[in-house]
Amino acid sequence: MVQDLRIINEAVVPLHPTVPNPYVILGEIPPSAKWFTVLDLKDAFFFCIPLAKKSQYLFAFEWQAPGKKHQQMTWTVLPQEFRDSPHLFGQALSRDLLDLDLGPNGKILQYVDDLLICSPDEKNAQQHAIQVLNFLAERGYKVSHAKAQMVKTKVT
C-alpha cells in the first residue's frame, strides 16, 4: 500500500540533505584495499526506519478492509513517498554503521543506500562481507541479492 503524502510533503519543512560527492568517497578507499564487496540496500528508504512517536500522527490514515468499518491507522516506520525518506534513511544507516567494527583490515564506505566494503585480501573480504551482512540483518536492513557484488577484485 502506498499512501498519497503530497499534503504532508507540502506541510513539512524540507530537510536540506547533503549528498556526498562519490569521488570524495572513493578517495577514502585505503591503498591496501584489493578486494571489495558492494551491497545495495533493498527498499532502503522506508519500512526499516522507525518513526519517532511524536511524528506518527502526521502519517495517520483511514483504512477500510472489505466488510469492515473504517479504522484509523498510522505508520510507525518511515513510509514510502515521504520526501525526506532518503535523507532520514541515510542518517540512520550512518549512525548504525558507527557500531560496526571491521577491525584494522576493513573499511566500509556509504553512498546513500549503497555500501562498499574494502579489504586487503580475499580471506578478510569474505569475513567482512559476512560480518556486514549479519550486522545489517540484525538491524532490520535488507540487501538486494541481485545487485550484490560479493568479494571481487573489481566492482562497478
Where are these regions (language model features)?
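Retroelement reverse transcriptase polymerase core
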Residues: 1-156
